[in-house]
Amino acid sequence: EWEEDAWSTAETFDRDGKPELLVVDHYAIDQRWERTFRQAGITVMAIDDLADRTHDCDVLLDQNYYTDLETRYGKLVPFDALRLLGPRYALLREEFLSEPGVARSRGEAVGRILVFFGGVDSSNATSKAIAALVAMRRPDIEVDVVIGGGNPNRDRIEALCAQQPRFRFHCQTSRMASLMARADLAIGAGGTTTWERAFMGLPSLVMSVAENQVRAAKDVHD
């Protein structure tokens, strides 16, 4: 299967031109696929956070924090590969770099909460968070609820927000950095958003909603 995908990718390059850099971000791809393109003279950059397979790459990027960050990839990458490890290499969208409210100081009072559990949120943690916040009966707190366009519970979540005068519903927003800058607290999942919240200096209640989020969340907590 990997061979078929590699050949298909190679055909694309033959047709459209060979790239100088090939960025690979897929849990099912390992050294076999990557070697095909390194041998063709293409620089390969692998993005990973599982450290569960061998890579044949020139550059490895893992933006997450782990207590064994410097050693967890061991012999999984070539000895001369450039290793970009840790949150200092977090992949942030341009909106975060240009947001004027980056890492603003926040007081102890919580007046605005941001809820975001990723683009799909297959466990529907968003609805559970909304229910918990409504049960608090705090009319002094404003809540921004963000979901991705692929959320299967969109209509239900939008309806729940519409029932609460201080809740605002956002779908597939390009204003995430602005919403984080305005918030006093975030409630959400781990993953990439962890480093976006950290960059914005936003205190967070984090729940792991996928297996690959558990280890990083525990290590950051510790």
Predicted regions and their residues:
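Active-site and donor-binding regions of nucleotide-sugar-utilizing enzymes
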Residues: 1-79
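Catalytic binding pocket for nucleotide-activated donors in carbohydrate/polymer assembly enzymes
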Residues: 194-222
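Short acidic active-site motifs
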Residues: 5-8, 32, 153-156, 174-178, ...
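Generic beta-sheet signal
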Residues: 47-48, 63, 86-87, 146, ...
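Short acidic/histidine-rich motifs immediately flanking catalytic phosphotransfer sites
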Residues: 16-21, 165, 183-185
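A nucleotide-sugar donor-handling region in carbohydrate enzymes
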Residues: 56-124, 150, 155
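Donor-nucleotide binding loops and adjacent catalytic segments primarily
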Residues: 100-101, 107-183
